Amino acid sequence: MSARLLFVSKGEASSSTRYRALQFFPLWRQAGFEPAHLTVSGGAGATLAMLREARRADVVIVLRKTFPAALLWLLRRCARRLVFDFDDAIFCNSDGTPSRTRMARFVAMARASDRILAGNAFLARRAAAFNPAVTLVPTCLDSGRYRVDAGKPADSFDLAWIGSHSTRKYLAEAMPWLAAAAAKVPGLRLKIIADFDLPGCGVATLPVAWHADSEARELAAAHIGIAPMRDNDWSRGKCALKVLQCMAAGLPVVSSRAGANAEVIREGETGFLASSPAEWAARIALLAQDAGLRQRMGEAGRRLVEADYSILPVFDRLRSVIDGLA
């Protein structure tokens, strides 16, 4: 009889749901499991459905959600095995400041779980303080979706940034070094793959609406990927997905020296880490002047993703955890 896996999240549009659950469903089925997803975003109906389906499942995997104490108690009673999967610093506020409420719910969720799946080493350490049953399962992607042979514009030199309005602040804070880089690189253009534009940022922009079926192609059509971010608990909880996407598309990456980005990027091999406007501008100028370096770094990044952050090797790690519970 196939083991039933119930994945609970705030919705299919969430990147956590897509990258840490839904993309694995074909592999789960091939392995003889029965995966199902349920959206729980408030309301008594969704809550009752979760509890009902939890009773029918062999393993319940909660993605990036915590619950009020009473609901968590009910879920724990209904679930034979409970797994908590998270890839963000959901125990603090989005500006990195502490939150007693978020931390209390995070601690309760961690302690109630049979196993915790953490998206990076920082998150794993935080969870292990409350439950030693932690496995690091990095956020990964299907590298086969990303082509590295897309044509690139000849009349501009494009920096690709991919994100959403919620992460717009990181790009806005990059305006000083974007202007400095534009002074060094003729034709520099910022390609924003998101749901907004950033006029007046000190460099020409090309806004491109984000779509799941076109993001890989749009990335590959740029010259460099960039990943500016702050260095606080919230950003340390990020799992370098944007960096991995750029690498999968064959782009060298320049990133802030912070969080999982600094762990994934191999300095001078797959990209560069920068800490100041001058350093950002210098790294971008160096890559703009050396097509061979861009190609070597892009190829090295692609190999790294295929070896360590692609869907098959990560699924093997994930399955070993679930096999031990189901």
Predicted feature residues:
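Nucleotide-sugar-dependent
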Residues: K169, A212-E218, H223-A248, S255-E263
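Conserved catalytic-core segment of nucleotide-activated headgroup transferases in glycan assembly
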Residues: E12-L27, A31, A36, D142-Y146, ...
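C-terminal alpha-helical cap of glycosyltransferases
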Residues: I311-A326
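A short, well-ordered alpha-helix in the C-terminal region of glycosyltransferases
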Residues: L286, L293-D308, V314
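Membrane-proximal helix-turn-helix segments that form the acceptor-binding/catalytic region
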Residues: L48-R56, A70-C78, P98-I116
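Conserved acidic donor-binding segment of nucleotide-sugar-dependent glycosyltransferases
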Residues: R266-A278, L286-G292
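Carbohydrate-associated surface elements
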Residues: F122, C140
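N-terminal pre-catalytic "stem/leader" segment of glycosyltransferase-like enzymes
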Residues: M1-V62
